[in-house]
């Protein structure tokens, strides 16, 4: 009998009941809530006369709608200009207060983006099932946890029952071997993977990322990789547990302590795929061949190395692909065969649940140090992923590096990743962004998003156009 994959093990650990229709009932260990997808779920609970089944399994924080300027944040709820956004944040506060759920409110130093806050608080632990009403919950798979996004009706179901109906996925292995070149990061790995398999490549699969290049990554780098499993078409991304995982979790507020810690570690050390485990699909990449990546189009799969040119639709024989390229070029305002390094930028955004952790800010600050944002850049934002990340960055002096270079240093939140708060693009503007999605209008109606790593974003800010960051780090 073949061994089990990590995904198989996590599934079996949480299987409550297998159903005749092929679906199953899965137990959920951790539920993370934010202001956008939770109000209707709590209202459904009240209408049914129910309460959360296991209150301590839930944590919450507002992130999508919160303003990121210091002035607005000091003003509290009243300073949120948009009425719907203000109501959503207020409703989250009221619901958590009413039901006794732990919430890191807007001006709590522990507040931040849900997928930054969960891990940094130790609320995400190896072997857990983790869900949240947000597709990028896959981020938490970096800890060897089975984590994925859910819809609002499922948020209500988890609150009421601590279980979820799900169907088991296929197993995909993405193996990245070798050593990354200097200046190439986890973000470049995952963009290269998506460029290789496409945004539908992982459909119906849980992707496990493995290989020496993945093992060499920090936990923060692994979170970046798992975060963008969604853009590769998968619902789940995973990295096996190792000593780095255990060291990261140890001592965090929600982590086990004393005797329970030793028991937990003994359990976690088995959260790896067996040597003889079988995967339905295997994809292999050579880390040494990966260069800094830049997305050029309106899908994450439309991505190239920084030294390449955007495609010419006339050279594409497939009419569907040709049409897709033509539409993307038109929306993005680019010409066939235009060099990536000739794309003029208007704004730069360093932040989001993909790249707003302390390691990301350090990488960007290394590039920004002693340089100035180009005069042609209208705005360059740095938005830490949480109040604690911001606090640590300020302790290290990173805020001063950014401010002296001409960046804006903001309060934590989702910010310009999505047009649900005051930070957004104007129509026609090009933005170098460390976020995860670049479809039409994602950062604002008519906005044009280019996905890059934090180091590449900082390099673009000081250059005014894309440049291979390795030229600045040499």
From Swiss-Prot:
Binding-site list for [4Fe-4S] cluster: 353, 414, 417
Annotated transmembrane regions: none
Domain of life the protein comes from: Bacteria
InterPro entries in the record: 3-IsopropMal_deHydase_lsu, Acnase/IPM_dHydase_lsu_aba_1/3, Acoase/IPM_deHydtase_lsu_aba, Aconitase_4Fe-4S_BS, Aconitase_4Fe-4S_dom, IPM_dehydratase_rel_enz, IPMI_cat
This protein's pathway: Amino-acid biosynthesis; L-leucine biosynthesis; L-leucine from 3-methyl-2-oxobutanoate: step 2/4
Cofactor stoichiometry and binding remark: Binds 1 [4Fe-4S] cluster per subunit.
Gene3D superfamilies attached to this UniProt entry: Aconitase, domain 3
Keywords assigned by UniProt, alphabetized: 4Fe-4S, Amino-acid biosynthesis, Branched-chain amino acid biosynthesis, Iron, Iron-sulfur, Leucine biosynthesis, Lyase, Metal-binding
GO MF annotation, one: 3-isopropylmalate dehydratase activity
Needed cofactors: [4Fe-4S] cluster
Pfam families the record matches: Aconitase
Its EC number(s): 4.2.1.33
GO biological process terms on file: L-leucine biosynthetic process
Reaction(s) the record says it catalyses: (2R,3S)-3-isopropylmalate = (2S)-2-isopropylmalate
Assembly: Heterodimer of LeuC and LeuD.
Purpose: Catalyzes the isomerization between 2-isopropylmalate and 3-isopropylmalate, via the formation of 2-isopropylmaleate.
Family that this chain belongs to: Belongs to the aconitase/IPM isomerase family. LeuC type 1 subfamily.
Annotated protein name in UniProt: 3-isopropylmalate dehydratase large subunit
Organism: Pseudomonas paraeruginosa (strain DSM 24068 / PA7)
């Amino acid at each position: 009998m073949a061994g089990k994959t990590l995904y198989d093990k996590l599934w079996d650990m949480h299987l409550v009941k297998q159903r005749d229709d092929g679906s199953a009932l899965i137990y959920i260990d951790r539920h993370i809530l934010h202001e956008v997808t939770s109000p209707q779920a709590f209202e459904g609970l009240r209408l049914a006369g129910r309460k959360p089944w296991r209150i301590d399994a839930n944590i919450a924080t507002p992130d999508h709608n919160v303003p990121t300027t210091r002035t607005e944040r000091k003003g509290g709820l009243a300073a949120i200009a948009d009425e719907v956004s203000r109501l959503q944040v207020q409703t989250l506060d009221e619901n958590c207060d009413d039901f006794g759920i732990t919430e890191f409110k807007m001006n709590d130093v522990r507040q931040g983006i849900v997928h930054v806050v969960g891990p940094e608080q130790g609320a995400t632990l190896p072997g857990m099932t983790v869900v949240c009403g947000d597709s990028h919950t896959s981020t938490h798979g970096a800890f060897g946890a089975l984590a994925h996004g859910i819809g609002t009706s499922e948020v209500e179901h988890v609150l009421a029952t601590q279980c979820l109906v799900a169907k088991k996925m296929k197993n995909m292995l993405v193996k990245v071997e070798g050593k990354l070149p200097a200046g190439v990061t986890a973000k470049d790995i995952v963009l290269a993977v998506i460029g290789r398999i496409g945004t539908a490549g992982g459909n119906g699969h849980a992707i496990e990322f493995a290989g020496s290049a993945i093992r060499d990554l920090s936990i923060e780098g692994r979170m970046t990789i798992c975060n963008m499993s969604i853009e590769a078409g998968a619902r789940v991304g995973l990295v096996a547990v190792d000593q780095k995982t255990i060291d990261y979790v140890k001592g965090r507020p929600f982590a086990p302590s004393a005797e329970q810690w030793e028991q937990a570690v003994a359990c976690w050390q088995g959260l790896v795929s067996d040597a003889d485990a079988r995967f339905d699909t295997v994809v292999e990449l050579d880390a040494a061949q990966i260069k800094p990546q830049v997305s050029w189009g309106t899908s994450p799969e439309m991505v190239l190395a920084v030294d390449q040119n955007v495609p010419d639709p006339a050279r594409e024989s497939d009419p569907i692909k040709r049409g897709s390229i033509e539409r993307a070029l038109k929306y993005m305002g680019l010409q066939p065969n235009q060099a990536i390094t000739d794309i003029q930028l208007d704004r730069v955004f360093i932040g989001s649940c993909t790249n707003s952790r302390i390691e990301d800010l350090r990488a960007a600050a290394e590039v920004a140090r002693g340089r100035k944002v180009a005069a042609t850049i209208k705005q360059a934002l740095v938005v830490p992923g949480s109040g604690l990340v911001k606090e640590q960055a300020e302790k290290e002096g990173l805020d001063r590096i950014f401010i002296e270079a001409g960046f804006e240093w903001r309060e934590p939140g989702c910010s310009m990743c999505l047009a649900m708060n005051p930070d957004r693009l104007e129509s026609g503007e090009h933005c170098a962004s460390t976020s995860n999605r670049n479809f039409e209008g994602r950062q604002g109606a008519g906005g044009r998003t280019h996905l890059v790593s934090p180091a590449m974003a900082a390099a673009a800010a000081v250059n005014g156009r894309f440049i291979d960051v390795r030229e600045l780090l040499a």
